Amino acid sequence: PIDTVGREYGENYDDFIRLLNERGELVIRPDRASAHRCAYLIRRTGEDRYELCEDKVCKARMSIYGNDYDQAYLLREYPDELPEGFEKNPCKRDHYDKKSLFELISTFKYGYVIAEPYKMSDAKPGILRIYIANEKLKETRLLDYYYTDLDGGAARCRAVTPSGELDGERIGCWDELINTVTDIAGYISEIEYFTASIIFTDDGFVIDSIDTNPDLPPVAHSDELNDYLMTRLHEKRETVVVTREKWWTAFKYKRFKRFVKHFCRPGIRPYMQKLWMSSVWDDLRHNKGTTLSQKLWCYKRGFLSFRIKQYGLTKDNYKDFLSDYQYHWLNRINNSYQIWINDKTTTRYVFEPYKQYLAKYYYDIIKMEGQTCIKALQDIPEGFDASFDGIFALLRQEKLLALKPSSGTHGDGFYRMEYADGKYLINGTEMTEDGIRQMIEGFKSIYVITEYLFMHKDLKKIYPYSVNTIRVAVVNRSAYEPKIMQTYMRIGSSSTGFTDNVGYGGICAKIDIPTGRYYCAEKIIDHKFTPCPVHPDTGVRIEGIVPNWELMKKGITDICRFMPELEYLGFDIAITDDGFKIIEINIHQDLHKVAEHSEEFKAFFRAKLALKAKQYELKKY
């Protein structure tokens, strides 16, 4: 009954209590499978009176896989000897009222999901696990089945036949179960190998969990599963060659990780430390606008030296700005749910309720088992199959398509696919079908083919050869009230080709958030923002009102409310004639004009810095 799009039921703690009072019982489950965290039933026992109870499904699951139950000791007495480092929960009670229940939930260190409880069938008190393989996006195979139940509290594993026979009897609803699992597997055919764990209830079954890195069955596994795994092992041995160069690269990375752990600021990711060091080295060699002493002064305080001109840095004001190293250190600001937007294919799946704000997704191109495989995505028109022939037929119909990395940023790896006058063009260069096929087969990462977006006619006048996107930085600290903190327009030029990256020679213009007025266009020359009021290629003055501005602001904030788990996002927006489209979402966007950040935006970063410093017990950060 809860609307995950409109949130009509409500989404704060009072609404949760109202739902709990209506239902009488809810389950609070870890947001991901864990051997050390369990689920609890929250049960209403009277007026403003609640208790935490054992979830039998969770107990069965953890007993089956040999883990202790309730390692937080919330449902049992503390033992005389607690595990090393264990801290007693000060909010533990036998019974809770509304306030004390909130205090208890607030002590949970990890993510949990409050859900409708389901009861395991007394006739089948166990878990069925199915091993599934998706081969080259085309075929779904169910490789093996085994059932684990509890007989007097002890786990007992038994094989299940492909026809659903267990101990000589066929499992009820088997055909429906297999059809459901097969349909789900086909829908997510990008996942090559996984298991689905099924729990039987009195009125059917539920899929309790999906594991993309499963252990082997505890019983003798089927010939089909064995053949599949041995085939994949043989393929990997043939395709993966450990050269001296690869070995040396892996050794250097391992050594670098040790260096970061022992000599760099606690909490920084090795990848971000490497980026920072590369940026410093590049700045040291190529920035001719600062002296060596100025460079060293900046590096010691966490800034790249060109920030002296950009921010007007001095020894008196440098602490007023978020430094480059601090921003590297903060990564990642978002939690693990950032996986929703780490790649465009996943984003399309997650954003189904808001698909009108995305480009139409036509094809996925993935390397699987050493071959280039193609999947038709949700928005593909009828009559186009998942093949190169289908891609070329769609291109001939649409005339323009976008080909881009599923997880790319900055416009890197973007290709403009065009069909005009009987010829195929890639980024303006004529190519044959065979040439395009060879180019795509050479891709090592996942690519997507989407509709080619056309910007609003008013913005097209400024520069027609790129989309001229709007960057919208949003902070959602409370999960309920997302706020747009910074907006600016990026405009392409002859230096950027079909993209509008400011760092590659593009132009940026400020946008007034309340009104949508864009003005004060600038471009970066020698690391310094330089006025550029007129576009150098078209001669058009860069000033006006962004079309569909209010519609865009509402759409973006609605989307942020839809995924309140993420609190810091950067949207790249294409304004179109009839609305807007999201090109990509950044989880740790590039810093832009920190000197012009609002006080509220600065306060957000200060709070994040203080929180991380507390986590790592740092006094200086």
Each language-model region and where it sits:
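A conserved helix-loop-beta module that forms one wall/lid of the active-site cleft
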Residues: 1-38, 321-413
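Phosphate-binding site of ATP-dependent enzymes
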Residues: 24, 32, 37-46, 50-159, ...
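Short, flexible loop/turn elements at secondary-structure junctions
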Residues: 32, 117-119, 134, 198-202, ...
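C-terminal active-site "lid" helix and adjoining low-complexity regulatory extension at the edge
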Residues: 161-193, 200-265, 269, 527-557, ...
